[in-house]
Amino acid sequence: MEDDGYNYYGADNQSECDYADWKPSGALIPAIYMLVFLLGTTGNGLVLWTVFRTSREKRRSADIFIASLAVADLTFVVTLPLWATYTYREFDWPFGTFSCKLSSYLIFVNMYASVFCLTGLSFDRYLAIVRPVANARLRLRVSGAVATAVLWVLAALLAVPVMVFRSTDASENGTKIQCYMDYSMVATSNSEWAWEVGLGVSSTAVGFVVPFTIMLTCYFFIAQTIAGHFRKERIEGLRKRRRLLSIIVVLVVTFALCWMPYHLVKTLYMLGSLLHWPCDFDIFLMNVFPYCTCISYVNSCLNPFLYAFFDPRFRQACTSMLCCDQSGCKGTPHSSSAEKSASYSSGHSQGPGPNMGKGGEQMHEKSIPYSQETLVD
């Protein structure tokens, strides 16, 4: 699978299977990449616009995670035209070695930064709802800035192996230039699989399994707290309760649906070097992997639309800003943006992971009714 432009940690499991007929769609996949590029640049650009148009006094701690997530997605989607071209040319890379290294590196920086930001937002929402008073200091704006900086540094460091090992070389028949992971500088041909499996499995653990476990834990306690609140308070019955809890479920499930197929198929294929899958199963994994990758990439353009769909306040803020610009008004709809910041964070957990961020410095956020305002009309 060395000529596969999707598995950025390599995937040559040295199997004896015949992959001669393997060929992902040269039309569908590039089209999806370009669609994600167009929607992702527009949507994430709008997210950044709405966040930074809000006055500094009105911003909440979650806003820095939201903006950071949009930056990560935006940084990634701008590389998609390169990968669309690579796929359309049947894995012939015309852009040189440096662009191969850099674009691959940005993909992994995005993956790590996105899931770390989503985890940070989930933890921020946990603090806002479950432990609002005792942990109020952790949700100050400055703490969010420091945490975000640390997350970006960690993401950049974790992606370094891609920058180091990614390279270009002629294919076996010499007709194409491939952009692939080359471990020859540190391993023999017989031990390269160990590097591939080690880096691939570790990226799945750090970039999916551990963050997803943390997010599930946060949402479990959030759901418990909300359910307990509804038992104690007289609220409008089960309809609002159902809606509030269903939004939380959507945040976690969407993250899993976008990224689990990619990580699962990648890990299974790489483990084929150790477990020796039957050829039919091995070829099946290779065939579905490009499409699993497409699903995970869609996450980078999906988050803004999920905000708009699930959060009327964010939708209203965007509409107000657009209308305001068209009419030439000078004011910034602070109230809409501020409301967006709170509810927005809940919707963002779609992507590479659920990001729930509420954040905010106000001590009165301790009450669950605040969360209800945030997530429910």
From Swiss-Prot:
The record marks W83, R166 as: Required for APELA and APLN/apelin-13 interaction and signaling. It is a multi-pass membrane protein. Glycans are attached at N13, N173. It comes from the Eukaryota. Residues 1-28, 85-97, 163-196, 269-287 are extracellular. Disruption phenotype: Mice lacking APLNR are not represented at Mendelian ratios. Mutant embryos exhibit incomplete penetrance of embryonic lethality. Mutant embryos display improper establishment of the fetal-maternal circulation, such as underdeveloped yolk sac vasculature, embryonic vascular malformations and impaired cardiac tube looping at 10.5 dpc. Mice heart of embryos show reduced coronary vessel growth at 13.5 dpc. The heart of mutant adult mice induced by pressure overload display no improvement in cardiac dysfunction, hypertrophy and fibrosis in response to peptide hormone APELA treatment. Residues 335-349 have a biased composition (Low complexity). It is found in: Cell membrane. The chain crosses the membrane at residues 29-52, 63-84, 98-123, 145-162, 197-221, 245-268, 288-310. Expressed in coronary endothelial cells (at protein level). Expressed in the embryo, allantoic and endothelial precursor cells of the yolk sac at 8 days post-coitum (dpc). Expressed in the secondary heart field and somite at 8.25 dpc. Expressed in fetal allantoic endothelial cells at 9 dpc. Expressed in the allantoid and the invading fetal vasculature of the placenta at 9.5 dpc. Expressed in endothelial cells adjacent to syncytiotrophoblast cells at 10.5 dpc. Expressed weakly in the embryonic heart at 11.5 dpc. Expressed in the adult heart. The keyword Phosphoprotein does not apply. GO terms for cellular component: plasma membrane. Disulfide bonds join C17-C279, C100-C179. Residues 334-377 are annotated as: Disordered. PANTHER family: APELIN RECEPTOR (PTHR10489:SF953), CELL ADHESION MOLECULE (PTHR10489). G protein-coupled receptor for peptide hormones apelin (APLN) and apelin receptor early endogenous ligand (APELA), that plays a role in the regulation of normal cardiovascular function and fluid homeostasis. When acting as apelin receptor, activates both G(i) protein pathway that inhibits adenylate cyclase activity, and the beta-arrestin pathway leading to internalization of the receptor. APLNR/APJ receptor is also activated by mechanical strech in a G-protein-independent fashion to induce beta-arrestin signaling leading to cardiac hypertrophy. Homodimer; dimerization inhibits APLNR-mediated G protein and beta-arrestin signaling pathways compared to monomeric APLNR. This is Apelin receptor. It comes from Mus musculus.
